[in-house]
From Swiss-Prot:
CDD domains named in the record: PIN_VapC-like
InterPro entries (alphabetical): RNA_free_RNase_P (IPR014856)
An annotated Gene Ontology molecular function: ribonuclease P activity
Reaction(s) this enzyme catalyzes, per UniProt: Endonucleolytic cleavage of RNA, removing 5'-extranucleotides from tRNA precursor
Family: Belongs to the HARP family.
Alphabetical UniProt keywords: Endonuclease, Hydrolase, Nuclease, tRNA processing
Protein name (record): RNA-free ribonuclease P
GO annotation, biological process: tRNA 5'-leader removal
EC number: 3.1.26.5
Domain of life: Archaea
Function field: RNA-free RNase P that catalyzes the removal of the 5'-leader sequence from pre-tRNA to produce the mature 5'-terminus.
Pfam families: PIN_5
Species this protein is from: Staphylothermus marinus (strain ATCC 43588 / DSM 3639 / JCM 9404 / F1)
């Protein structure tokens, strides 16, 4: 059975990988990751893919987090970039029906989060107004906005496909019968619904280590 994998951004950026690779920095993870993919391709014939949008997202993330250009180029050179076939790939209509229903529930939850934040902000604003504490009021506004963003994101985005980038990955994995490497619960959920294999990053790395050890006697 061919080893075909589709990599999400989290396949590389998962913080648990530092311990597995025995390094302290993301740059170290990327270098070890690239070496592992190259060796797995040569020894095991494994193939590694990602989509153009994920490749761009991954490169941008790594650059923002001080990963060297050399390490990034090593990694990207080990991964084949391929666009999914969005025109002929078929996905059951029930998936879209469930997604719409889920989003309606999430929108309602998001509205409740916003309403609660407005009420809290009004109470805090009144208290600081009575006390004539302008600085305290401004800090309270900033805190309320931060809380709103976190709770709104939790209510509306966690555990659901909410970007074209994520959707493209699942379609590509479905199209080429690959195993999707991700720690994103929304992506995992869609994979389960349409029968796409998936694996979390730590298990993926350990799986490659094990296969290499069985084939060569060493990693």
């Amino acid at each position: 059975m061919p080893l075909i994998y589709v990599l999400d951004t989290s396949a590389v950026t998962d913080p648990r990988l530092r311990e597995i690779f025995g390094v302290k920095t993301l740059d170290g993870v990327v270098r070890e990751y690239a070496r592992l993919l190259i060796r797995s391709h040569i020894v095991l014939g494994a193939e590694f893919y990602t989509t153009p949008s994920t490749a761009l997202e991954l490169r941008s993330f790594l650059e923002r987090n001080n990963v060297s250009r050399e390490a990034i180029d090593m990694l990207m050179g080990a991964i084949t970039i391929r666009s999914p076939d969005l025109y002929t790939t078929r996905i059951p209509a029930i998936i879209m029906s469930d997604w719409i229903h889920d989003m309606l529930i999430r929108i309602t939850k998001g509205l409740r989060v916003a309403e609660d934040s407005v009420r809290r902000a009004a109470r805090r604003g009144y208290d600081y107004g009575v006390a004539q504490d302008k600085k305290g009021f401004e800090e309270s506004v900033a805190e309320t906005i931060h809380e709103l963003r976190e709770k709104y994101r939790e209510a509306t985005r966690k555990g659901v496909i909410d970007t074209r980038v994520d959707f493209d990955l699942v379609v590509l994995a479905h199209e080429i019968n690959g195993e999707l490497v991700t720690n994103d619960t929304g992506i995992m959920k869609l994979c389960m619904q349409i029968g796409v294999k998936y694996i979390e990053p730590p298990r993926f790395i350990n799986k490659l280590f094990l296969l290499l050890r069985e084939r060569t006697g060493r990693v």
